[in-house]
Amino acid sequence: SGRSIETYNMFDKLCEHKELFVKVGGHPMAAGFTITREALEPLREALNRDCNLTDADLVEKLYVDESCAIKQLTLPLYEELAKLEPYGTANVRPLFGIVKMGIRSIKMVGNEGQYARCTFVDGNGTRINGMVFRGKELLDNIKVWFGDKECDKILKGLQNHALIDILYHMKKNEFNGTVSIQMEPVSIRKSVYYET
């Protein structure tokens, strides 16, 4: 079985070589098949030979539903969006974006310090927390984008000049009887508005 990407119709590509299969079925984004061991290598060669994907086709595309300021991220909005569940391929979870966000602080957490608990801040000083699950990757990127000194300031919770753009999901956090809305970042990049 296999899963595909939007730019590659896996089922059609497999059907172009249907003589190699015992049986094959699926749709553009996924397929399943039964094949003999002897036909496996000819299939691999045919699919690789006929593949017309470009580097651009392999870049993940994220579709933002709305640009949403921190002050708009409220529990009532979260509860309204929760009515759209369950999320899946045909009903994707709403994705929001904010540009020119500051990073107030990062604290590495988890058994191996692999997650980054972040506090983000907008231009008005409004703050929101978020958990980045690829925390070490985020720290490495911050060092590349802004330098070691700015990264150290962020880790110490000091004033810094880092600006990022974030794509995120809203998440409800319940801790010690307190309910709050957090960001669940999906993608973070150096802000297009950052000036060195």
Where are these regions (language model features)?
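Acidic, two-metal ion nucleic-acid-processing modules in DNA metabolism proteins
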Residues: S1-T196
